[in-house]
């Protein structure tokens, strides 16, 4: 079967979502050799992945992930692909806590660093959080704190079969696109950053195929987030329709800032940065970068009439300093809840 698939891809033939889903279920089960995986990834990349192919791969991963009980209330995710190579501070993690403080719970799917010196998982771990509490503990955090972190390796163990190939290839493939698309909580609202501006609209259409109700996919001047230093190319998904947009910092009422103002450091420094920022002590460029991205999430979720209003709400939440308390509560719950779950399992 695989040779026929590779021949078709090399001839420029697109796969259906169902075909791609079946292939990725084989990947997850460890049924494909490293040579077959290499050929599949490279052939898809050379042809150019379609929204249907990406959606099929994402469905396979969602369908085989560790289950997470979806809440009935509205919640969201803000996650980027990484891979932009810019080594900026970990904006998306701060965005999640700010959005939660503004009333929008966030189930953040994430991993360790891809393009920066510190990913979401690295920063939270440096703050003392447990990355791998049981799913029910994470759901409790979402309910009680308005934030939970779903660590990708914990929920998608089958992806380990692709790691040797990804390390050997050292090029971007469909695997680099999938992280933000396979949140096991299947959030109805999402802001997704992407490393390639040419994939912005593709990704928005893919989210629609996956059942996302409202989304914004962004690439800002080389960053997988809304930028302060350049216009941001965006695609908004609403009611099944994708609309292309261009976002300028002035649209949100914040000042431009050079990308150099957002350069990051290692986990310990990022943890301190995150704590200070959420306590209302962030540098202006850091504050505005987080606010415009949190504002986009609040806008897309319907908590604000537009980006400017959403950004103002985010700035208010940042200024209050209360998001830092939310961070402290999450760290404690992730650690203590995991310990309680282990004790119950031991005595149960």
Swiss-Prot record:
Chain sites annotated for binding 5-phospho-alpha-D-ribose 1-diphosphate: 80, 83-84, 88, 90-93, 108-116, 120
GO terms classed as biological process: L-tryptophan biosynthetic process
Pathway the protein contributes to: Amino-acid biosynthesis; L-tryptophan biosynthesis; L-tryptophan from chorismate: step 2/5
Keywords assigned by UniProt, alphabetized: Amino-acid biosynthesis, Aromatic amino acid biosynthesis, Glycosyltransferase, Magnesium, Metal-binding, Transferase, Tryptophan biosynthesis
Free-text remark on how the cofactor is bound: Binds 2 magnesium ions per monomer.
InterPro entries according to UniProt: Anthranilate_Pribosyl_Tfrase (IPR005940), Glycosyl_Trfase_fam3 (IPR000312), Glycosyl_Trfase_fam3_N_dom (IPR017459), Glycosyl_Trfase_fam3_N_dom_sf (IPR036320), Nuc_phospho_transferase (IPR035902)
Sequence positions that bind Mg(2+) 1: 92, 225
Residues where anthranilate 1 binds: 80, 111
GO cellular component, one term: cytosol
Broad class of enzyme this protein falls into: transferase
Cofactor list: Mg(2+)
Record-listed Mg(2+) 2 binding positions: 224-225
PANTHER family in alphabetical order: ANTHRANILATE PHOSPHORIBOSYLTRANSFERASE (PTHR43285:SF2)
Subunit structure: Homodimer.
Function summary: Catalyzes the transfer of the phosphoribosyl group of 5-phosphorylribose-1-pyrophosphate (PRPP) to anthranilate to yield N-(5'-phosphoribosyl)-anthranilate (PRA).
Record-given protein name: Anthranilate phosphoribosyltransferase
Species of origin: Sorangium cellulosum (strain So ce56)
Lineage of source species: Bacteria, Pseudomonadati, Myxococcota, Polyangia, Polyangiales
């Amino acid at each position: 079967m695989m040779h026929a698939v590779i021949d078709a891809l090399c001839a420029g033939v697109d796969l259906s979502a169902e075909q791609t889903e079946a292939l990725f279920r084989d990947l997850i089960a460890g049924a494909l050799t490293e040579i077959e995986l290499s050929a599949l990834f490279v052939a898809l990349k050379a042809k150019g992945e379609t929204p249907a192919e990406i959606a099929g791969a994402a469905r396979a991963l969602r369908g085989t992930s560790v289950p997470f009980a979806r809440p009935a209330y509205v919640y969201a995710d803000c996650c980027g692909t990484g891979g932009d190579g810019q080594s900026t501070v970990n904006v998306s993690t701060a965005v999640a806590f700010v959005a939660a403080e503004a009333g929008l719970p966030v189930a953040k799917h994430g991993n360790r660093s891809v393009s920066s010196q510190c990913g979401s998982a690295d920063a939270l771990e440096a703050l003392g959080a447990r990355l791998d509490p049981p799913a029910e503990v994470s759901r409790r955090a979402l309910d009680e704190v308005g934030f939970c972190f779903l660590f990708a390796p914990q929920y998608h163990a089958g992806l380990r079969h692709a790691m040797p190939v990804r390390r050997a290839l050292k090029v971007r493939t469909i695997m680099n696109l999938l992280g933000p698309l396979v949140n096991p909580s299947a959030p109805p609202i999402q802001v997704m950053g992407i490393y390639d501006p040419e994939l912005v609209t593709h990704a928005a259409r893919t989210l629609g195929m996956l059942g996302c109700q409202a989304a914004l996919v962004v690439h800002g001047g080389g960053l997988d987030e809304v930028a302060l230093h350049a216009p941001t190319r965006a695609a908004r998904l609403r009611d099944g329709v994708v609309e292309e947009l261009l976002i300028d910092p002035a649209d949100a009422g914040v000042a431009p800032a050079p990308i150099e103002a957002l350069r990051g450091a290692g986990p310990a420094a990022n943890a301190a940065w995150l704590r200070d920022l959420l306590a209302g002590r962030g540098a202006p460029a850091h504050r505005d970068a987080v606010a415009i991205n949190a504002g986009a999430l609040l806008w897309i979720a319907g908590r604000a009439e537009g980006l400017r209003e959403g950004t103002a709400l985010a700035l208010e939440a940042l200024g209050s300093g209360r998001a830092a308390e939310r961070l402290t509560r999450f760290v404690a719950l992730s650690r203590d809840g995991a310990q309680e779950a282990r004790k119950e399992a031991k005595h149960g």
